[in-house]
């Protein structure tokens, strides 16, 4: 991952926005931004690897910068944090070193340094769009949800892992037209997760095909940090027999492009 970031630094501003130190090991927090940053243009934040083990979010963010970002030069400012949780990425872990879930900790006084450093990076800027790239994996159900129940002393209730791509919109302002534009683009790349027999995905009622909502700010989710009018969290299913790692990365890229295209079409000039 780091060599790819270094190569991209020829085209984007490489920003070190913090450093984590865990058990004597240091992890630099890196982002890449439009160069120059034009204050007259709208801005989009793209984040990946909030859960470090969700590989396609990291790979998709980097692939977007490598293959598609040039098409948006002069139209939108981009700030991309491709791997918010590098310790988790290296160790294939959902949580950070302190057994904290970063994607429930995005508050200024929260316990996750991955989260607080990203908040400080984003805070000085105004964003029209924030898309946060995630996966739902079999290990969520088989490993991390049982571990969460054990950690918190609560019963573990088995669930179903959705087979396919879906989006988590903000319950307070879901912007369904925006979400549906992303779903339409992604379904050309990979399949969209169907609801279960109760009409739900991960226990939440669908509000449109492939779309559920969470109260992002209440849950301390990454997608809540900017207050942008257009936000979403992508979820790819990499363990599906119907999807390859390349498709998962391509789905993330398609989601980012569709999100940018929708917002730019709505906010010309």
Residue ranges and their predicted role:
Residues 1-269:
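Structured catalytic-domain cores with a bias toward divalent-metal coordination
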